[in-house]
Amino acid sequence: MPKRRRIALIAHDHKKDDMIAFAQTHKAFLMRCDLLATGTTGGRLQDEVGLSVQRMLSGPWGGDLQIGAQLAEGRVDAVIFLRDPMTPQPHEPDINALVRACDVHNIPCATNLATADLVMIALGLAQPDPKEIHA
């Protein structure tokens, strides 16, 4: 039996509606995964999509860093981070640290919907684990 994928879902305020639509599109797959998300995004995913989500703090309060820590410990298989490139973020250093951690640990990190869709397809089809291919 394949292991359950562990996926982090994060969305900036102006991208939260996009995240909800994305999660609804991929709900069948996401329900077979262990999900973690920053606070507000996780709450909306639970309430509006009906997904079971481990909620971290909100991004500006350290949620991005909490996800980054789990990623560094090998407990995250992919990050879907719908960023708003048009709005400055007060916690930009935390965001950069999370994306850097994805690069350092060779974890897929989708920052737009097109890439997020491709990551979902790849995770659904991947045997073996994508991280093991380039180890």
From Swiss-Prot:
Entry keyword set: Lyase
Residue spans crossing the bilayer: none
Catalysed reaction equations from the record: dihydroxyacetone phosphate = methylglyoxal + phosphate
Domain MGS-like: 1-135
GO MF, one example: methylglyoxal synthase activity
Annotated positions binding substrate: H12, K16, T38, G39, T40, T41, S58, G59, H91
Matching SMART domains: MGS (SM00851)
Any one Gene Ontology BP term: methylglyoxal biosynthetic process
Task performed by this protein: Catalyzes the formation of methylglyoxal from dihydroxyacetone phosphate.
Family named by the database record: Belongs to the methylglyoxal synthase family.
Protein name according to UniProt: Methylglyoxal synthase
Naturally occurring in which organism (per UniProt): Ralstonia nicotianae (strain ATCC BAA-1114 / GMI1000) (Ralstonia solanacearum)
